[in-house]
Amino acid sequence: MGKIIGIDLGTTNSCVSVLENGTAKVIENAEGARTTPSIIAYANDGEILVGQSAKRQAVTNPHNTLFAVKRLIGRRFDEEVVQKDIKLVPYKIVKASNGDAWVQASGKDMAPPQISAEVLKKMKKTAEDYLGEPVTEAVITVPAYFNDSQRQATKDAGRIAGLDVKRIINEPTAAALAYGMDKAKGDHTVIVYDLGGGTFDVSVIEIAEVDGEHQFEVLATNGDTFLGGEDFDMRLIDYLVDEFKKESGMDLKNDPLALQRLKEAAEKAKIELSSAQSTDVNLPYITADATGPKHLNVKISRAKLEALVEDLVTRTIEPCRIALKDAGIDASKIDDVILVGGQTRMPMVQKAVADFFGKEARKDVNPDEAVAMGAAIQGAVLAGDVKDVLLLDVSPLTLGIETMGGVMTALIEKNTTIPTKKSQVFSTADDNQGAVTIHVLQGERKQASQNKSLGKFDLADIPPAPRGVPQIEVTFDIDANGILHVGAKDKATGKAQSIVIKANSGLSDEEVERMVRDAEANAEEDRKFEELAAARNQGDALVHSTRKMVADAGDKVTAEEKTAIEAAVVALEAAVKGDDKAAIDAKVEELSKVSAPVAQKMYAEQQAEQPQGGAQQAEPEAKHDDVVDAEFEEVKDNNKQ
């Protein structure tokens, strides 16, 4: 069997590695560089350029040079962050027929996985040239905070590139693997702070020796899938554009050629300011007007850059705080801090991390190469070449389904070790309901609508039965790639339906922030919503049982009683439609009060009818303690596609 290579598919740069003689080796590309720019260009003659060659011609071909496409992978066109990106990139981002964000180059619309596949092909070829044999299998890394659809899209990119993706692993976990393999034995806890070109992740990882085996266990992970070096570049570009506008009155944002030159200059200046205190951005002939050519010349100090990006650096600290809290660990208990991603070379970032964790980060881990090296080690583990490593990763976000009252019922909590499988029994909301819709959600909020919808599917042909009687077993199964498989089964008939969740979209910046904003901010709102949902469910159940009781009682109920009960039922139904919990509680009490005499009358009659001596108990209405009422839409046959 051939080697399983490790690929770090980055937003800005990508890297490929392979395990040789027990050590992960980063492979140099055809240009002699250890990393390859994640840039793809479509030349006029139809040639596809990847990496440095694409970057070199970007200024003369801005519309057909695609960069930072990873930020669009698994995302919807209408998302705010995508709309923001549209204004900042010289190439065209378009809306696909399914609502996804695609890109346009050379008059062709293409999906982000197609573009990423070109980078993966280059990585594959780099490895093949070095190894002298075909490469068909790879481990590809993704940001730890990538959601299900983004992981699926990355796997698709691998398939398009002709690679069998043996495993998708999280970037911080891969970096910890590269760091921990050659360290002294013994248990220690590390933080991996990964600020790359387009994404930010932080993971708390425990490295332990268990029966002579290196065990890497992720305790918690957090992050932001739309925060990275590209955002730092954009701040600098905005500043340069504003300075030029003040001086010349011309807006360079409308000039794709100038924008491409600015991007290159901003990236270069940012890198220079990591070691120098100031730098000059000098772009002659940046544009022209009727009076002749215009030149841009701006001096930037490190302090100015730091002022421009201060809030971006601050934004990375809150996920660190949440990850520590989720892991149940104090910052003082962290043994080592590992910095990954090129943006962590910025002194301001290093200082912010050192201040928060109370210790300097290690300098012996290459931030550009550690992730690919870790992926290569995982590839060797899967191939059986490395036998003393066990990797225990986690699911970054809570997964569940929508249940009665618009509540999200969690099946798999965030930071659960994967692979994992969890089942729970639900039931129907209406009598004789013939089908249920399973609505799968990902996120941290109690209100279903506040979470990310991953998909829906139907389980039909449920035999007629009173509500609450059918037992529908829903099973969530997350594989080692962090990809979700969902199944539903009617326990009475054995009829089952299952899907691999293939959502069309990824998480927007706002959605991610909404989901992971911790309990402190949303606890009160979530608690109120849960209480309101519970009150509504109680009201619905009382309406249903009261109407059934009145129907069963027949002429034993007087006309006055019937009128009073019906009025109370109508009042409760109206209250349940509102958002006032106190009003619902009051109407529940009112209905209970007016229906109590009828209930007592029915109970007395039942007692009288029972045979004397060892009276048998009337069989209660079917009820299962482990059944959670779930709100499902009945799928009408004439609506089926």
Curated annotation (Swiss-Prot):
Induction: By stress conditions e.g. heat shock. Residues 620-641 have a biased composition (Basic and acidic residues). Residues 602-641 are annotated as: Disordered. Residues 604-619 have a biased composition (Low complexity). One of its GO terms (molecular function) is ATP-dependent protein folding chaperone. Keywords: ATP-binding, Chaperone, Nucleotide-binding, Phosphoprotein, Stress response. InterPro entries: ATPase_NBD (IPR043129), Chaperone_DnaK (IPR012725), Heat_shock_70_CS (IPR018181), HSP70_C_sf (IPR029048), HSP70_peptide-bd_sf (IPR029047), Hsp_70_fam (IPR013126). The modification Phosphothreonine is found at T199. It comes from the Bacteria. The keyword Ribosomal protein does not apply. Pfam families: HSP70. Belongs to the heat shock protein 70 family. NCBIfam families: PRK00290.1, prok_dnaK. HAMAP family: DnaK. Acts as a chaperone. This is Chaperone protein DnaK. It comes from Pseudomonas entomophila (strain L48). The lineage of its organism: Bacteria, Pseudomonadati, Pseudomonadota, Gammaproteobacteria, Pseudomonadales.
